[in-house]
């Protein structure tokens, strides 16, 4: 009777853990689907950033700027630094698993390995983000040396960048230039900083695409496990 009672208790604990495992796997799959969508959004944003930065570089190297060129320099510059390229990864399920004692509740070791790989690559991406931030700081500093940023209008939505052309004309009449400097070397250095950052952004794009593929592989593995 004692043995049977022990076995019954063990079975109940086993069933409870399997229910927990199932819930965690379902939750993990949903988190990963959100990550896949989020990464797609950021990949698209990086494509737009690369396109804008290339146009901006070419414009900065022009010998003579038209009023349209000057407006473009302002708009592309400000849109460049307003573009969000960093994915907002979900971590709810992973955090819950860690709080529950790690991945011990997950019996499929291939899933455990894939989750660990996914989380490890996420940390590698975060290291790259620190390097990106250093380059963004250089670009911000260059913009503060070159642009009358006080002509920036109040945005009504994300990436809604508007330039107050009337204010820019007023500053031109007051200072003699639509920019804070007339030194072309400042603009060339700015173009150089943008080129460097485009390279970093391109590499970052590759990294988050790799993470997206890891997420898709893990989703497939989770779906197979949940189908059993």
Stretches with model-predicted labels:
Residues 1-7:
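Hydrophobic membrane-insertion alpha-helices, especially the h-region
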Residues 7, 11-228:
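Long, hydrophobic alpha-helical segments that serve as membrane-spanning/inserting helices
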């Amino acid at each position: 009777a004692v043995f049977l009672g022990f076995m019954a208790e063990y079975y109940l604990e086993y069933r409870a853990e399997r229910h927990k495992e199932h819930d965690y796997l379902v939750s993990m799959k949903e988190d990963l689907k959100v990550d896949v969508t989020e990464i797609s959004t950021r990949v698209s944003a990086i494509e737009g950033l690369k396109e804008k930065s290339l146009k901006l570089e070419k414009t900065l190297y022009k010998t003579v700027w038209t009023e349209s060129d000057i407006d473009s320099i302002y708009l592309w510059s400000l849109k460049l630094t307003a573009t969000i390229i960093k994915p907002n990864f979900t971590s709810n399920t992973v955090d819950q698993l860690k709080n529950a004692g790690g991945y011990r509740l997950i019996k499929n070791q291939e899933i455990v390995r894939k989750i660990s790989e996914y989380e490890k690559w996420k940390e590698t991406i975060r290291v790259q983000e620190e390097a990106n931030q250093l380059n963004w700081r250089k670009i911000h500093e260059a913009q503060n040396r070159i642009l009358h940023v006080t002509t920036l209008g109040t945005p009504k939505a994300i990436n809604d960048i508007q330039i107050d052309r009337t204010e820019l004309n007023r500053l031109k009449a007051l200072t003699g230039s639509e920019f804070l400097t007339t030194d072309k070397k400042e603009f060339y250095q700015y173009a150089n900083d943008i080129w460097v950052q485009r390279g970093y952004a391109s590499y970052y794009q590759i990294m988050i695409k790799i993470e997206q593929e890891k997420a898709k592989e893990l989703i497939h593995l989770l779906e197979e496990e949940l189908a059993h």
